[in-house]
Amino acid sequence: MASCLHNLSEYDASLMPCKDKVKNQRYAIAVADWNSNVTYPLLEGAMQALCENGAEHVDVVHVPGAFELTYAARKFQEAHRYDAIIVLGCVIQGDTPHFDYVCGGTTQGIAALNARVGMPPVIFGLLTVN
C-alpha cells in the first residue's frame, strides 16, 4: 500500500529481469484519453521504466476512456505478439453512479483477461480517485 513512507512509484532495478531478456520481449500499452492530464504522464512513466530496463519493442494504442481498456487489452492478447500488456486509465468520482459502473466493469474485464490460460498478463494501471 502506498503511503508517505512508501512510494510505489519507486522500484528496485536489481529485481527487474535482465536487460537482455527484456530487450527481446514485446510489450503493449493501452492508454485512455479521458483524463489525459493524468493518463499521459502515466504513459510517459511506463515508457520510461520499460526503456530504462531494456525494452525496445513497445506498441501503444489510445482508447477513448477507461471502459475501452478491456477491449484493447483483449485485442493485444489475441494478436499473440506480446509478452505483457499494460492498461492505463483514470476514473474520477463524480455525483453519479457512473464511477462505480466504469470502475467495476473495467476491473472485472481485466481480471477475466488475466484468467485466460496461455495469454500474456495484463498489468492493471487504472486509477480510481475522488
Q: Model-found features: residue ranges?
A:
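N-terminal amphipathic/basic leader segments beginning at the initiator methionine
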Residues: M1-K23
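C-terminal binding/interaction regions
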Residues: A2-L5, Q25, T106-N130
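Glycine-rich phosphate/diphosphate-binding loop of Rossmann-like nucleotide-binding domains
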Residues: P17-H62
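Short coil/turn connectors at secondary-structure junctions
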Residues: K23-R26, A55-E56, H80-D83, V117-I123
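Short, ordered loop/turn segments at secondary-structure junctions
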Residues: D33-W34, V63, C90-V91, L126-N130
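Active-site rim loops that border cofactor/substrate pockets in soluble metabolic enzymes
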Residues: E52-H80
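Short beta-strand segments at enzyme active-site cores
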Residues: V60, A84-L88, P120-T128
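Glycine-rich phosphate-binding loop
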Residues: A72-I110, N114
